[in-house]
Amino acid sequence: MYEVFADLHVHIGRSENGKPIKITAARSLNFANIAKECAERKGINIVGIIDCASPYVIEDIEKFLKTGDAYELKDGGIIYKDKVCILLGSEVETSEKGRNGKCGAAHNVCFFPHLKDIKGFSQEMSTHIKNITLSTQRSNISGYELIDIVEKYNGILIPAHIFTPFKSYYGNCTDRLKDIFKEKYDKIFAVELGLSSDTYLADMISELENKTFVTNSDAHSLPKIAREYNKMLVNDISFKEVVKALKNEDGRKILANYGLDPKLGKYHRTHCDNCDSTIETKEPVECGSDKVTFGVFDRIELIKDKETTKSPENRPPYIYQIPLSFIPGVGGKTIEKLLYNFETEMNILHKLSEDDIEAIVGEKIAKNIVNAREGNMKVESGGGGNYGKVKEHD
């Protein structure tokens, strides 16, 4: 077995012929470009593309498989240039009963082994979604109902960015996932933490103790791929092996979660848009404004059922790592210079010594990169849709 890097949440902005898929994502973010970016610049071995249920994207996948650069695996997934395994996924917004009798919405990332499976899923979901061609459209079914449809087409379901204020289970639907999935709760074996939380925070909720945590980028542009990712131990790169790693089966497992310090996330703390301030509070804000975004940290403080975090013994480490583009002094030209010399971001973040980096970009920037990848940079909390800020290490 060997170690690989996986980012299981990447969007598509446009189809190959320019049809809109994810309106808020970059036009350059199409199926082929994602595969190329992961192979040539990021060094990501497994990527989950979560807009593959769009008929426009299905057409692109069929063309992609005819190029000679890619092929489907028996164990699931598409291999690109023998470097990257692409998992075919779909992000689905479900309709839930929210808190205090209000309607809630939650996002789920669903993955399928083969093109025929996601085709079947797409066709069935078109009866539950008004416009199946677009990404993450609201469905008229709940997560409880969705998981049965996903399994019908040999797929898996992972609740996405579970604490995000607007479109997540804990964020605006429920205090307990078990209340949503009921007797099907054990079919959920992994959850996605999201950019504003980490293992320390999530493990304050008892029902998550037996769930695998995944950290993904939720990328809306090519540079944002792998801003969060996972290190896995697998026998090969395929859908089947990823599922085993998520289930901790046969020696396969998640070795580490690499993610932002939650303070850098856009929704870490509560934010009042009326007075444009990030508020540190454990209780709902009452300032007279109806434009208050309740933060992930503050939500967890309200719903946690443990006074101190306690992770199970098999929980992998969560390693704070700042993406190159967030690091002070590292602009586009510097990144291009680094990639020209060292090929991929994973090489820069995991394999190179400080001396190697210093030889290319100088002492100050090299020191910042090393401090960032070791979690030694100071950060200022984000909130209300604004990212936190990275400050240079003293």
Predicted regions and their residues:
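An N-terminally biased module of ancient metal coordination in phosphate/nucleic-acid-related enzymes
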Residues: M1-C103, N368, A372, N376-K378, ...
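Divalent metal-coordination and catalytic microenvironments
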Residues: H9, D51, I86, C110, ...
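Active-site metal-binding loops of divalent metal-dependent hydrolases
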Residues: V10, C52, V92, I162, ...
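Acidic/histidine-rich catalytic cores of soluble enzymes
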Residues: V191-Y200, S206-L208, K224-I225
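Short acidic/histidine-rich active-site segments
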Residues: K211-R227
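Extended substrate/RNA-proximal surfaces in nucleic-acid metabolism proteins
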Residues: E3, N17, I58-F189
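Helix-hairpin-helix
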Residues: Y320-F342, E354-K364
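Cys/His-rich short segments
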Residues: D250-Y318
